[in-house]
């Protein structure tokens, strides 16, 4: 994403992001209760993948359990490629059979719900999970579909023309969340 003119507001600092991920991992563990061995974290490309890995590390610190972590590319499932332009497909890596599992879809920002609809379609091509839970770091509203996260790091009401930017060390050389407001 290129820089845009206007105001940039810090929403989560690196420390805030770390604490939020710890809280989200705790919530997932609590909801899973005795089914921790059935959990699979699937990060949606691009930033959902490193977020899923960070959540997996947090779960391991909390519970001593190592969860399978996968990567989900939804390029061929999108219904909005004509609007957003062509995308280069990324790797889908599903480490275990999803049948009978509890899949936690991990995404950085939920907006219209279209990405998640595409992800749900993709997941079912890899098995029939017992349940699919949605974890979104930021929920900015403006839903076009009846999709709501099971776990939310931060609800952030935004204007449609604003941009929420999740920054991760491995991609952006720093951690945090920013809101970019147009001028």
From Swiss-Prot:
It is an enzyme of class 2 (transferase). It comes from the Bacteria. It holds the Pfam family Pribosyltran. Signal peptide: none annotated. A motif (PRPP-binding) lies at residues 103-115. GO terms for biological process: regulation of DNA-templated transcription. Its EC number is 2.4.2.9. Keywords: Glycosyltransferase, Transcription, Transcription regulation, Transferase. SUPFAM superfamilies: PRTase-like. It catalyses: UMP + diphosphate = 5-phospho-alpha-D-ribose 1-diphosphate + uracil. Substrate binds at residues 46-47, 87, 107-115, 140, 164. GO terms for molecular function: uracil phosphoribosyltransferase activity. The keyword Transcription applies. Regulates the transcription of the pyrimidine nucleotide (pyr) operon in response to exogenous pyrimidines. Belongs to the purine/pyrimidine phosphoribosyltransferase family. PyrR subfamily. This is Bifunctional protein PyrR. The gene is pyrR.
């Amino acid at each position: 994403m290129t820089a845009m003119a206007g105001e940039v507001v810090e929403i989560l600092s690196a420390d805030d992001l770390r604490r939020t991920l710890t809280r989200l991992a705790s919530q997932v563990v609590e909801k899973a209760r005795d089914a921790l061995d059935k959990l699979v974290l699937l990060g949606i490309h691009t930033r959902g993948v490193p977020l899923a890995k960070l959540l997996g590390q947090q779960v391991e610190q909390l519970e001593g359990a190592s969860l399978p972590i996968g990567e989900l590319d939804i390029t061929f499932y999108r219904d909005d490629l004509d609007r957003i332009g062509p995308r280069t497909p990324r790797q889908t890596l599903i480490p275990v059979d999803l049948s009978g599992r509890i899949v936690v879809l991990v995404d950085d920002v939920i907006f219209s719900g279209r990405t998640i609809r595409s992800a749900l379609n993709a997941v079912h091509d890899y098995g029939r999970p017992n349940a699919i839970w949605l974890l979104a770091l930021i929920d900015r509203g403006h839903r076009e579909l009846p999709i709501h996260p099971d776990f939310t790091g931060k609800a952030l009401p935004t204007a449609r023309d604003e941009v929420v930017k999740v920054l991760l060390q491995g991609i952006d050389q720093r951690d945090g969340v920013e809101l970019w407001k147009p001028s």
